[in-house]
């Protein structure tokens, strides 16, 4: 009987063992950095009430209109696989009373879902790392988030390959004033607009500035600038932010048509972009969203955050040939030729793990010839092969072969192995 193979859903990719060590390195780099800054992890459901995203992201957005995985459950309730993390994070904070006269610095990591056209660096299930700071006013916290990003890029090795772009969306009344100016401008060029932009013109014209249609880019660049209608308070806030970037030595450029693709943003917004992935690509984006908590039924609460897609980070590191550098942890492969040697190998492996917690120790438990085991050892990426053959067992010695150099193989007493590793791998 021929059985059809079931494959992964289009745009939802498997991450295989050859890549997971690099993914783990990227994830752990993020986590270590945020812990050093005093941020704490929060976890919330992958599935939420659909209204959560319609209310926060905005109904006239590509995400809500075209990209959300929405369906009715067995009770007839409309639920949605989360397309982004901020709304769920804020919902959890409100529901569990985390914002009552408190400040929260939080991070999260997990899968998000959008029914987009799959392409390089963009998938229907993608992994997002998010950072949110709630209950904190002023530009200092915005500057801290930018500093976190810069440290992440440095730790991952590509700080020279990304650029920071910033803008201000001002207060809601300023955006409303700008909206009228923008609509008038766009109506004067109505014949140029694509169907999506025409549809957005009355309901959410700022979305036109977020269009990726290459035929509209000149029109967008020539559009009136929101920054020109900002009031004194918004100008002062943005100037304070820019001054802080200069004090911290963080290069930036002001992008006057930078708007975030989600309705809840206001005041400072930013993106980190790179030209290493073909056309200019955004690898991280964020900004201030002081109205979001109130949108969801909470008390007015200042908030700011950012998010980045791990697939895009992986792709950038791959392009810059940084993946091997991220996977250079020292490891050892123990070769054992028979049952007695395998038992000795298991004992030795535990001893090494106890004495050297940072070392990865791989033990061959299936026996086999030396040639096949050396192939396995080399393929594993191990630095050293520890060999326990019949001669070694008889003499209670272990032979050691450096798999990455031409250094001659040596033998030492088994009791000296931890001392040897301490010196050799220092």
From Swiss-Prot:
Transmembrane segments: none
Biological processes per GO annotation: histidyl-tRNA aminoacylation
Principal location listed in the UniProt entry: cytoplasm
SUPFAM superfamilies tied to this protein: Class II aaRS ABD-related, Class II aaRS and biotin synthetases
Enzyme Commission number(s) from the entry: 6.1.1.21
UniProt keywords, alphabetically: Aminoacyl-tRNA synthetase, ATP-binding, Cytoplasm, Ligase, Nucleotide-binding, Protein biosynthesis
Single annotated GO MF: histidine-tRNA ligase activity
Name of one Pfam family that matches: tRNA-synt_His
Catalyzed reactions: tRNA(His) + L-histidine + ATP = L-histidyl-tRNA(His) + AMP + diphosphate + H(+)
InterPro entries given in the database record: aa-tRNA-synth_II (IPR006195), aa-tRNA-synth_II/BPL/LPL (IPR045864), Anticodon-bd (IPR004154), Anticodon-bd_dom_sf (IPR036621), His-tRNA-ligase (IPR015807), HisRS-like_core (IPR041715), HisRS/HisZ (IPR004516), HisRS_anticodon (IPR033656)
Compartments, as annotated in UniProt: Cytoplasm
Cellular component annotations (GO), alphabetically ordered: cytoplasm
Subunit structure: Homodimer.
Homology family: Belongs to the class-II aminoacyl-tRNA synthetase family.
Protein name according to UniProt: Histidine--tRNA ligase
Species annotation: Legionella pneumophila (strain Lens)
Gene it is expressed from: hisS
